[in-house]
């Protein structure tokens, strides 16, 4: 299925896309040594010494571009599973690097500021949860951005939702002390699911947990844990914190993604929170 994102023009991810040479296929050695597949993604950037942030589900790349332009001192890795969206986002970044017109600008209200080099942005076509689990070394990521992820509303698809025990365990592992998982969604059922997990993984000294939502999501989470059990933390590795709007967001926005702008026009409600690594 094609979404026609290129509007008849071939999409060219170019050097923005992480290549197979940079991320070779995992060898069979990971069956006996899980660390054998680890690769430091900081090496994929022009300045590997900068802090690293990861966006899960970059879509058309709007947040990634805006945030990277606002924070040139930080490296950003966008991960997108849908190939056409991955190619489209990488192509947008490549064109802005080259000073070419951004074909999305007029429709998604992306800042009309002069294009910057954006050498601090790379795109990866992968399953983000699996990439973080098998590839990312301990303690190297400052922020994981998770905005408007697929809610997978059917019960048989709940296992595909990003927030799970395994994901939260791996996020805690790869984040630096004080690092963050930043979450925004418009989907009430997904928020209930997420909140039920947050209750078990994050301390809540400020009363930020949506306890009503967590109670609604508890049955689905309990069923998921019975079917695919994963060890629970002995000590909660996160602390819940309020969500502060992103620097590149427009007036009244939280992060400024394409989905957020679309859903705001539709009058939808939003939920947001930060999990900070203790």
Question: Residue locations for each model-derived region?
Answer:
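Conserved SAM-binding loop
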Residues: 89
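Class I S-adenosyl-L-methionine
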Residues: 190, 196, 201-278
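Conserved glycine-rich SAM-binding loop
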Residues: 59
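Conserved SAM/SAH-binding beta-strand->alpha-helix loop
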Residues: 82
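A short glycine-rich, Lys/Arg-flanked "PGG" loop and its adjoining helix->strand segment in the class I
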Residues: 163-177
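S-adenosyl-L-methionine
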Residues: 1-54, 62-71, 93-138
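Conserved beta-strand signature within the Rossmann-like core of class I S-adenosyl-L-methionine
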Residues: 177-185
